[in-house]
């Protein structure tokens, strides 16, 4: 085991178009097979579509969508004796951000629109309005934590 503690977080390069680290994180989540320019084209196209549909700042809309998708609680498996319990725990800020981006991109891929740009754009718009599959995933996660509240004393 390392003795120096966890590795330091690398600084995130802000994207050149919007100057926002959140957009950079979204690009990195969309990224597949190292094709960064394709991922950038998808994300920038989706954000441009958000701007056209809402006539407002697309980064603000994205941040609102992420806030609506971020989970506050989740369940983690904990083995006690012979039984495995689903223990509700609070989600740290960094993990909440990562989960919200992962869910947003994942449920964008599952949508029925033609291009990934359209899918991502519509999922961002739905999430910013409190709708969509990513928001439902957050609600399901919270519901699971609520129903397992009895095991909260096993928290670590």
Swiss-Prot record:
Keywords from the named record: Ribonucleoprotein, Ribosomal protein, RNA-binding, rRNA-binding, tRNA-binding
Annotated InterPro entries: Ribosomal_uS7, Ribosomal_uS7_bac/org-type, Ribosomal_uS7_CS, Ribosomal_uS7_dom, Ribosomal_uS7_dom_sf
Record-level Gene Ontology MF annotations: rRNA binding; structural constituent of ribosome; tRNA binding
Membrane listed as a keyword: no
PROSITE patterns, alphabetized: RIBOSOMAL_S7
Keyword Endoplasmic reticulum found: no
GO cellular component: small ribosomal subunit
GO annotation, biological process: translation
Gene3D superfamilies: Ribosomal protein S7 domain (1.10.455.10)
Any Pfam family the entry gives: Ribosomal_S7
HAMAP family attached to this UniProt entry: Ribosomal_uS7_B
Recorded family membership: Belongs to the universal ribosomal protein uS7 family.
Assembly behavior: Part of the 30S ribosomal subunit. Contacts proteins S9 and S11.
Role of this protein: One of the primary rRNA binding proteins, it binds directly to 16S rRNA where it nucleates assembly of the head domain of the 30S subunit. Is located at the subunit interface close to the decoding center, probably blocks exit of the E-site tRNA.
Protein name according to UniProt: Small ribosomal subunit protein uS7
Species of provenance: Kocuria rhizophila (strain ATCC 9341 / DSM 348 / NBRC 103217 / DC2201)
Record gene name: rpsG
């Amino acid at each position: 085991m390392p003795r120096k503690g966890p590795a330091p977080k690398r600084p995130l390069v802000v994207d050149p178009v919007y100057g926002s680290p959140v957009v950079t994180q979204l690009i990195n989540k969309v990224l597949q097979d190292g094709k960064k320019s394709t991922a950038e084209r998808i994300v920038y196209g989706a954000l441009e579509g958000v701007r056209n549909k809402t006539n407002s700042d697309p980064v603000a809309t994205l941040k609102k969508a992420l806030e609506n998708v971020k989970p506050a609680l989740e369940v983690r498996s904990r083995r006690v004796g012979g039984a495995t319990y689903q223990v509700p725990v609070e989600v740290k800020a960094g993990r909440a951000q990562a989960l919200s981006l992962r869910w947003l991109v994942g449920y964008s891929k599952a949508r029925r629109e033609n291009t990934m740009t359209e899918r991502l754009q519509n999922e961002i718009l739905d999430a910013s309005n409190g709708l969509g599959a990513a928001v439902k995933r957050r609600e399901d996660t919270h519901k699971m934590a609520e129903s397992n509240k009895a095991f909260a004393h096993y928290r670590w």
